[in-house]
């Protein structure tokens, strides 16, 4: 499991401008597998359609004070695990890029554990070609 986490390059932290119309992250476009536009508190998503021959990028933005702990599982393996600081007033972002083959073909799940029920977050999963 540690080898899978080490296979991806992770960049967590930073601040990003809010997306159009007050969203935390813009729509991911044609490379997008998942877009969770706006959630508050704990949550997550399950999806299918991942392909193991492309890199996978998971990006989370949040605000409201506190933090969001993010995990991603693919076919029974934990492939990402990171925490994003969620400042008040300006969104914080965290992102992980997983090499081809780390996310396996088929379904995956992402969990977001917010430190407070008022933490607002959004996420995208893309597989750029």
Report residues per predicted region.
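N-terminal, post-signal-peptide region of Sec/Tat-exported proteins
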Residues: 51-73
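Secretory targeting and sorting signals
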Residues: 1-20
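Noncatalytic modules at the cell exterior or secretory-pathway interfaces
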Residues: 53-59, 99-125, 129
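Short, surface-exposed beta-strand/strand-loop-strand elements in extracellular ectodomains
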Residues: 66-82, 123-126
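Solvent-exposed serine/threonine-rich low-complexity stretches and specific carbohydrate-binding patches
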Residues: 31-38, 78-89
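Transition segment at domain starts
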Residues: 16-49, 128
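Beta-sandwich interaction modules
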Residues: 44-49, 87-105, 126-128
